[in-house]
């Protein structure tokens, strides 16, 4: 069987002799950005960068953005001259996989965004901070939001809105509405619930915010698979990990939500902390760099979480899967979510697990690790460029569907699930879009 992941650019890395150098800022309040001078401008990142491929602009490439960062902190460019180019970066980290010099582009980008965030004014930033602070971490408000979306879709209101063409008045709103998945009405998961064998290895499952509202069934599928493989699953207090706030450069919110998440995930005293959302997992795995302990206890907690946190496919790949109850006849193409493949370096485990399911045939997807254009809320903030990047991805998906006869497209991140479902529906392809854990769960569920 051929490998189901065909990287668009084979990874390569070595340490450059300038690795310890930094770019000294002339602005007193700007970051040192250690490692900025490591870039040797070789251009290996260019064919790996979705925004460069879409625009052909050097300023929309990792190399170009690093140059702009350097000029900005040396007071040779105004913030307004570089901000649009940094905002258009997907933060997919694909350039880091391609870079032969080991440039930590993602860290440099986030530090620069964070230093700019306090200077930003206006309604857009205030609205995002309100959502990050008061909606995403709030269990009650999230459940109400989910119910209202469910009611909008199931009551006939959505059909009426479409029939009257009301969304055409606000094209941006129409784009956002098109991305909404069908909101599930599954039984809610609540803190303190436990599942699986009483003597099983204890694990905590992050419920999160957006993941639980849009994709609650994936949590139940995760519980099914973990329980079948001998794990005792505990549901912690709901928290938002702060990933979206981090991407927006709102470090104060990121830290506050981060510490809440650390305490919630460790409270059940698990052997492992399990994440089934690539974006959340990459954020939590970066807590050791993002969060600043204020006590010995916080330092201990941070070290403990760093040792225990795993993507669900990482944990399951530690040993052969338990026997399945029945076959799952599917031809599956796998899209490697950026924050799983490029940030967490979880690259082989998802397809290795899928290959163990009787009935599954893996279909190669060209450029499987190239970004789909979702990138958190990027597809809402930059819909045109996001659609262009998605169109490139969908060419490869269409080939896997029509030539390889794939009838399922799978990926391990909610943003990618939203984006690719939108792409598949727009292209009118006869494919389901599923999380890998949902495919595994089909083999364990009693029918």
Question: Where are the predicted features?
Answer:
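N-terminal, well-ordered alpha-helical segments
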Residues: 47, 67-71, 80, 84-87, ...
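Short secondary-structure transition/capping motifs
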Residues: 58, 78, 88, 94-97, ...
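Iron-sulfur cluster-binding electron-transfer modules in prokaryotic oxidoreductases
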Residues: 3, 105-447
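Cysteine-centered iron-sulfur cluster-binding motifs in ferredoxin-type domains/subunits
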Residues: 33-52, 83-103, 339, 369
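N-terminal glycine-rich anion-binding loops that anchor highly charged ligand groups
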Residues: 43-47, 57-61, 233-234
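Non-heme iron-sulfur electron-transfer modules
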Residues: 2-28, 52-84, 102-130, 430-439
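Generic, well-ordered alpha-helical segments
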Residues: 61, 78-81, 87-91, 100, ...
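Short, intrinsically disordered, charge-biased short linear motifs at domain edges
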Residues: 24-36, 75-86, 226-229, 357-362
């Amino acid at each position: 069987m051929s490998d189901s992941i065909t990287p668009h650019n084979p990874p390569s890395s070595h340490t450059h002799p300038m690795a310890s150098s930094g770019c000294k800022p002339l602005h007193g309040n700007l970051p040192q950005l250690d490692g900025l001078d490591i870039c040797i401008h070789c251009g290996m990142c260019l064919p790996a960068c979705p925004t460069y491929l879409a625009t052909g602009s050097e300023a929309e490439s990792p190399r170009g953005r690093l140059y702009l960062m350097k000029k900005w902190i040396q007071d040779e460019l105004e913030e307004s001259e570089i901000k649009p180019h940094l905002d258009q970066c997907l933060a997919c980290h694909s350039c880091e996989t391609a870079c032969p010099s080991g440039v930590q582009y993602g860290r440099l980008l986030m530090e620069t965004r964070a230093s700019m965030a306090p200077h930003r004014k206006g309604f857009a930033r205030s609205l995002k901070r309100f959502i990050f602070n008061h909606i995403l971490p709030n269990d009650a408000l999230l459940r109400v939001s989910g119910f209202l979306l469910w009611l909008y879709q199931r009551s006939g209101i959505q059909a009426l809105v479409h029939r009257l063409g009301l969304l055409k008045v606000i094209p941006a709103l129409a784009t956002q509405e098109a991305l909404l998945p069908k909101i599930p009405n599954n039984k809610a998961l609540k803190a303190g619930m436990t599942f699986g064998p009483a003597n099983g290895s204890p694990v905590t499952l992050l419920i999160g915010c957006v993941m639980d509202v849009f994709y609650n069934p994936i949590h139940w599928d995760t519980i099914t698979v973990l329980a079948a493989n001998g794990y005792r699953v505990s549901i912690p207090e709901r928290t938002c990990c702060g990933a979206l706030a981090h991407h927006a450069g709102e470090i104060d919110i990121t830290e506050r939500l981060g510490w809440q998440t650390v305490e919630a995930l460790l409270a059940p005293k698990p052997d492992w902390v399990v994440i089934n959302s690539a974006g959340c997992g990459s954020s939590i795995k970066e807590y050791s760099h993002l969060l600043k302990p204020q006590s010995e206890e916080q330092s201990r907690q941070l070290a403990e979480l760093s040792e225990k946190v795993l993507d669900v496919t990482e944990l399951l790949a530690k040993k052969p899967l338990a026997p399945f109850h029945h076959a799952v006849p599917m031809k599956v193409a796998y899209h490697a979510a950026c924050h799983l493949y490029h940030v967490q370096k979880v690259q082989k485990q998802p397809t290795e697990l899928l290959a163990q399911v009787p009935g599954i045939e893996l279909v190669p997807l060209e450029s499987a690790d190239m970004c789909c254009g979702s990138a958190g809320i990027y597809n809402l903030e930059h819909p045109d460029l996001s659609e262009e990047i998605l169109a490139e991805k969908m060419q490869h998906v269409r080939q896997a569907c029509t030539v390889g006869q794939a009838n399922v497209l799978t990926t391990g991140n909610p943003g990618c699930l939203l984006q690719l479902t939108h792409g598949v529906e727009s292209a009118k392809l006869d494919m389901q879009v599923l999380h890998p854990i949902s495919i595994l769960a089909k083999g364990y569920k009693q029918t």
